[in-house]
Amino acid sequence: FIIGFDGEKDGAGHRIVDFVTRTGIPAAMMGMLQALPKTALWARLEREGRLIQGEDAAKGVNQTNLLNFKPTRPIRDIANEYVDAFCALYEPNAYMDRVYSYYLKMGAPRWKAAAKLPSLVDLKALSIVVWRQGIKRSTRTRFWRYLFGMARNNPALLEQFLSVLAHNEHFLEYRSIVQQEIREQLESLPPEEPTAQKELQPV
């Protein structure tokens, strides 16, 4: 999901979170729009004088970087919506709800892998998930309810369910990185000039 398109209305971040929640997508990738060199978007923005970095500085990384052009609405509004939405998507309870909903709807796999003993790495990962999500955090009640729900209703996907729950340990760390790096970039921006749209509004 991308935020920062021309003509985008306020609340785009909230609409993305609402859509992901209603559809039950477990891991939703999200970023701010970046113009890449030698693309039609880059050429148009260059003609319009809206690029704010040259080709050498264009990174293409859209999760921890601000837009590299002047958008049609305040960049601070877009950035704050993005950070709020990213954090909401990977809030532990919300993420767990989506993962459970997703795996309950999935049918059992048509093939069955050969049974094997879990490795030490697997056991360590499982212990981390159980400790953090099933004991330490506010997700503890959900965790055990959903775990037993999966074991009862879709046991063939129980291992995958736990594996995807474990992914949120990475996303939770990445949330902090996104917040910090975007906030630092916002602090370094000069004050924004009023947009033409605001200037034309009646007094």
Where are these regions (language model features)?
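Terminal low-complexity segments of carbohydrate-biosynthetic enzymes
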Residues: 104-105, 112-203
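A structural motif corresponding to the C-terminal lobe/cap of the Radical SAM core domain
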Residues: 1-126, 130-137
